């Protein structure tokens, strides 16, 4: 649930606006967040706030009617335990699987380091959904990872 507050946290502690927009996050413990989530359940990704690693997530656009109803009941029973977000399209990358090379959904985690100076590391961690069609990239849910490096070409152009 902390994610919903990140823009406010940045403004409070850094006295500046966030550079990158935050993914819209609805807190089901707030009446307007709960109502929006219930009204748009089939369009949203609904996540438990106390879980990690992709557990307990309902991906509305990919869920059956029964799964959506089960999710609705869980949210209604304990709204303070849930958030929802719009479904974000993940890019795909060629991935080596048992049958050859196939496209799989990926996301990229980049890292910044601060001290006397601040810099962004020249690479990151790409997480990949190894199951065909899956949007869940978490390793605990069968996802994999790849080091990602940004290389500079010193050859003249």
Residue ranges and their predicted role:
Residues 1-157:
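Domain-scale recognition of functional cores that engage charged ligands
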């Amino acid at each position: 649930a902390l994610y919903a507050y990140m823009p406010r946290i940045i403004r409070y502690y850094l006295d500046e606006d966030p550079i990158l927009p935050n993914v819209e996050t609805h807190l089901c413990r707030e009446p307007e967040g709960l109502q929006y989530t219930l009204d748009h359940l089939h369009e949203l990704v609904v996540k438990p706030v106390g879980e990690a690693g992709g557990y307990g997530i309902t991906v509305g656009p990919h869920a059956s009617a029964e799964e959506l109803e089960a999710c609705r009941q869980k949210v209604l029973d304990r709204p303070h335990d849930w958030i929802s977000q719009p479904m974000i399209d993940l890019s795909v990358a060629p991935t080596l699987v048992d049958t050859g090379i196939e496209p799989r959904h990926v996301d990229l985690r980049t890292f910044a380091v601060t001290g006397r100076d601040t810099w962004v590391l020249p690479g990151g961690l790409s997480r990949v959904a190894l199951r065909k069609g899956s949007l869940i990239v978490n390793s605990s849910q069968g996802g994999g990872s790849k080091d990602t490096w940004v290389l500079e070409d010193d050859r003249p152009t």
